[in-house]
Amino acid sequence: MNPGTFAGTNFGTNLSGSPTMNIVTATAQMALSGYQYVLTNASASTVTLPATPAPGDYVYVTVANNLVTNTVARNGNNIMSLAQDMTLDNPYAGVQLRYANATIGWVLT
């Protein structure tokens, strides 16, 4: 398997209903699975992903502050098989991250 790819697994375990929306007005936010975080702070915000996610856990992040410096912090888990945080460098970005496994970590869906 190549980095950034994954084989089929049941990722549908947390698909019941819509995510709970949380308006972020601070520079830091600890994320919970099943939540959508809308970044509205005048300064860049960092959303830190859960430290011990289960396969199928998901987090939405939506940029609403028109900045290109907001960050999704990996909190010890990979994002798309990379051991690095993700900068949301689009002022209109909206991303969903779903946890796959310990090797791949969080994937963009």
Predicted regions and their residues:
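Tight coil/turn sites that cap or link beta-strands
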Residues: 3, 34-35, 90-94
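Exposed extracellular interaction/assembly regions and N-terminal maturation sites
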Residues: 5-75, 102-109
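Short edge-strand/loop segments of extracellular domains
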Residues: 74-82
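Short, aromatic/His-centered strand-loop micro-motif at the edge of beta-sheets
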Residues: 82-88
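Low-complexity acidic/polar repeat-biased segments
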Residues: 88-109
